[in-house]
């Protein structure tokens, strides 16, 4: 995974905001915001990844003008549209189907339980100068303590974007 202080790579990927498809070019959206949160997951419906995304959506962070929030999955935009609806996500869910962007952020899983070249699970916070201010990665099925969104909220606060860390209810094993 990229480390704090490194420059975040630009990218352009297809995605959906709700059920509206479009292209998401990071450079077009990064300008004018104080911080960007990129949530990498292999699939929006992977058990603990789904819990993180649900909590991120419930937090309401995406409704803030100074903050950009995107989920980046290995799913198609069709599956992402369903996930956005099922999880009530208020931010774009973007398809990195071949894990090219995940590779540039060094969060690609080469071979994970029979799945090859998929985005791993991680969170990256980027400042307006494209500098990585927070980076975290773990196994897609791990239930971390504390939840990764606690550290994401702290990194946002350091950038002057005061947000509350959402409570994450992990349902792994259901």
Predicted feature locations:
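Chalcogenol-based redox active-site neighborhoods
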Residues: 1-174
């Amino acid at each position: 995974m990229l480390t704090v202080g490194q420059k975040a790579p630009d990218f352009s990927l297809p995605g959906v905001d709700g059920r509206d498809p479009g292209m998401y070019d990071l450079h077009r959206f990064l300008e004018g915001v104080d911080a960007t949160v990129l949530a990498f997951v292999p699939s929006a419906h992977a058990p603990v990844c789904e819990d993180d995304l649900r909590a991120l959506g419930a937090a309401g962070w995406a409704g803030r003008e100074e903050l950009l929030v995107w989920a980046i999955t290995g799913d198609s935009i069709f599956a992402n549209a369903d996930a956005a609806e099922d999880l009530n996500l208020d931010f774009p869910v973007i398809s990195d189907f071949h894990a090219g962007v995940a590779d540039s952020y060094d969060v690609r899983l080469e071979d994970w339980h029979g799945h090859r070249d998929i985005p791993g699970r991680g969170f990256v916070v980027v400042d307006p100068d494209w500098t990585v201010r927070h980076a975290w990665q773990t196994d897609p099925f791990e239930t971390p303590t504390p939840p990764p969104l606690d550290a994401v909220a702290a990194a946002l606060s350091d950038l002057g974007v005061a947000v509350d860390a959402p409570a994450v209810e992990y349902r792994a094993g259901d």
